[in-house]
Amino acid sequence: VPIGEVEFGGLTPPSQKDLTKVGNFKPDNTITYDITVNQSGKEVPDAKVTDILKTPNISYVKDSFEIYKGKWVIADNRWVLKNKENVTSQFKVEFPSESEFFIKLGKINKGEGYHIKYKAKPNYKLQSGEVVENVASLWSSQTKIIDSIAKTTYLEAGGSAEGYVYSITLHKKDETSGSSLAGAVFRVTRDRNGAVVGDFTTDSTGKVTIPNLLKDKYTIKEINEGGRDLLAEIERQAVEQLDIKSKGN
């Protein structure tokens, strides 16, 4: 592959896709993203690429955007953008919010393709094994053609990556009688980046288990009773249990 040409593919024959998205962590903890547009070589009228950072507290490096135009071809079983031209100055990257952008590419002629590169950075210390999620989409006018989801795993240098293998069990009890209470709804939020893990409801035994957690600190709030915040620090892989007491009605 000539110096400066970007390639995508591997041992299996590459498929023709309207849009792909991949991400890679760099040693400085930034994430480099690559979006390929129109490997399928179609004509796409009024084309637009949108992008959303699904993981909270990740920011775009706004001066890192590069846009290349050329023709996607398969060489040595890989996609390569041939005859590429840097057309960054011809397009405006617009940011409706800090967690999304879009680029209006206009009409893409048959056989034309684009490669969009940019960086993003976390605004907090990532945990080893943590996954950062990002979604790119290709549109033609108001019609979405395809989504591409990039899930990029952060691995700490020299460290292990246990990942999302932790869980915690909540047990809601009546403060007076000690009996288990069903139907209590708890919202679990990760303290490090403010990501809402989800809302969880206790079953007939008054218990609910929250799975797939990182080893980290979380805030647990009962949302259907105006309950107080509870802090939970996940320290070990075994299921931990918090007993939560409530005054009877």
Regions found by a protein language model. Give the residues of each.
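Solvent-exposed loop/turn and edge beta-strand elements of beta-rich ligand-binding domains
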Residues: 1-249
